[in-house]
A protein has these predicted regions:
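Terminal and domain-boundary accessory regions
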Residues: 1-192
Length: 192
């Protein structure tokens, strides 16, 4: 398909919670969100990049710094307060902020702004949304890891799957942990 500018218009949608656990448990290393954005938009015209994440209430200062870092790097950050979920069988509680609906809403509300959607998630709940986007003529790519992607999501995109392991040398963080250690003003920008 030829594009008027010679480059595809691309929007990126990052399921932050899914990517956190993919990195922590699936990869054993963390990527730098600014480096990731540079790599994913390399040959294309970036129209939007969204990062979705749950926040403790009140927000933890590290989370607030990470949100500022993401915005500085070029992401539109969508947040939702974490909810406590009680499991009556085990008596355990977990905290969760499900942003799947927000991701799909943004995918469809901005559908005329991009030619290609890149989803960073391994969550099979996105299978139907991707099928509908494909029926509207959109190119799709899912970024995750082989071991942390639902089979139905992997099958929905076929060869349009990118394994984070293949990008490690370009996107791996060189500092510790998933949140920036330095103030936002010292974090590298997307264009640097």
């Amino acid at each position: 398909m030829g594009y008027p500018t010679g480059r595809r218009r691309v929007s990126i949608f990052v399921d932050g919670a899914n990517m956190f656990y993919t990195q922590k448990k699936g990869l054993g290393w963390f990527f730098d969100p600014a480096k990731l954005l540079r790599v994913l938009r390399e040959d294309d015209q970036l129209t939007d990049a969204y990062w979705y994440m749950g926040l403790k209430q009140p927000p933890d200062p590290r989370d607030e710094n990470f949100v500022r870092f993401l915005a500085y790097a070029g992401y539109v950050v969508r947040t939702k307060g974490l909810k406590t979920i009680y499991d009556s069988e085990t008596g355990e509680t977990t905290q969760k902020a499900n942003l799947d609906v927000e991701i799909v809403m943004d995918m469809f509300n901005t559908v005329n702004n991009y030619d290609k959607a890149i989803l960073l998630s391994g969550d099979g709940d996105f299978e139907r949304a991707l099928e509908l986007l494909r029926s509207r003529g959109k190119e799709l790519c899912v970024v995750s890891t082989q071991n942390w992607i639902a089979a139905e999501l992997r099958m929905a995109v076929g060869s349009h799957f990118l394994d984070l392991q293949e990008l490690r040398d370009k996107i791996e963080r060189t500092d510790r942990g998933p949140a920036p250690e330095k103030p936002v003003t010292e974090s590298p920008g997307v264009g640097q």
